Amino acid sequence: RPGDDPYFVDAADFQTAPQQTVLQPGEVLCNIKIPRSSLTPWRTNFKRMAVCTAGYAIAIVVTAYHPQTQQVRFGVGGSLQSPQLIEFDAIPTVEQIAASFQGLTFLHDERGSAAYRQHITQVLMQRGIAELASETEGPRRY
């Protein structure tokens, strides 16, 4: 990049592939700005399934639920080439979650097939929203 001036990148564009970001050699992430309106009154949780021997994630799901509006947002990573935001206007059904995967390509490697990663991602999404909607808390890692 010409010059050393700070620049801004949207969170959705930051990670480009597994273990790859938009940062160039020598660049350092110095600041993350999250608007307060993006944090409250959302309730959130984090779910992760990993290969225990290696510690690599099969799937990561961050769920955000807005109790007043019933909106739901899922940040999905680990199972896809780069993280994705999946949004719903109301608590989704199992079928709606499955349909949200249309057009997404799940990773297939020595840690898990694409079908396995898709299944685990869906299970973590379902568990995350069930816990938030019922105000309970389950395990974060499986």
Predicted regions and their residues:
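C-terminal structural segment of proteins
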Residues: R1-Y142
